[in-house]
Amino acid sequence: MKLKNILLACLTLLLTFLLGACSSNVSDPGLDNWSKYEEKKQITIGFDNTFVPMGFEQKDGTYAGFDIDLANAVFEEYGIKVKWQPIDWDMKETELTNGTIDLIWNGYSATDERREKVEFTIPYMKNEQVLVSKRSSHILQANDMAGKVLGAQAGSSGYVAFESNPEILKTIVKNHRATQYQSFNEALIDLQNDRIDGLLIDRVYANYYLTEEGILDQYSVFSVGFESEAFAVGARKADRTLVEKVNTAFGKLYQEGKFQKIAEKWFGEDIATDQVKAYKNN
């Protein structure tokens, strides 16, 4: 009996230790966790590791992209290291809410629907949803997609825009739905192989990918009427200090010319929003 009690006590201590260790690696969703990030000197950012040129995995297994470089520069200002966590993009808000990641940062459009769940930083870059089609298909405007098969990434801004503005594409495409993909790469493969006729996608991704692959001349990239978007960083509602710190770093990096240097590397031009250019911590 005495041995049993000792074993139970040891098991209780072990479970307590393991739970404590696990909880220390997960941020509390209901608290402002800035002091914890400072203490650990680490923050976890969730991203889609196929979204070129914003954040993607290279052939050697390392991560690269505009958002990767920008986020690393932001947290370097505070002596905090970024842990990059690839996630299912369709589950991004869930991963944020449950504390698995601390930020969503990867070409994340700040929409009214998302603002209900997420605290956004100031927008740092503009974007729009465009349609990509093969030139040989002669699809050059939205109406040309009548009865055609459309593709989009699940959980993407493009898919949200498709559902929210049915008059633009949903009412005319085949079956009034978009084939959903887990990544843009998968969708582009299907477009190349004629399994879909058009792909709703971020302009920055389309231009960069098709240019890098040397196939831009084989495709048409055009607007179909969706409103332009703004990329911002998403945090939990309680993490207001974190949001302010990111905003402050945006402004500082721009004033020092570092923001522009990163933008030039990936886009060949300064893409900062007016909010970034004018931001000063009050």
Question: How should these model regions be labeled?
Answer:
Residues 49, 126-133, 203, 211-248, ...:
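Periplasmic-binding protein-like
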Residues 18-21:
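C-terminal motif of bacterial Sec signal peptides marking the signal peptidase cleavage site
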Residues 23, 68-77, 143, 148-149, ...:
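Extended ligand-binding regions for polar small-molecule ligands
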Residues 85-86, 90-103, 117-119, 143-146, ...:
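Short helices/loops that flank or line small-molecule/ion binding pockets
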Residues 26-107, 245, 256:
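Extracytoplasmic small-molecule ligand-binding "clamshell" domains
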Residues 91, 108-116, 161-164, 189-193, ...:
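A ligand-binding cleft/hinge motif common to bilobed small-molecule-binding domains
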Residues 57, 71-80, 158-180, 210-215:
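Ligand-binding cleft/hinge of the Venus flytrap
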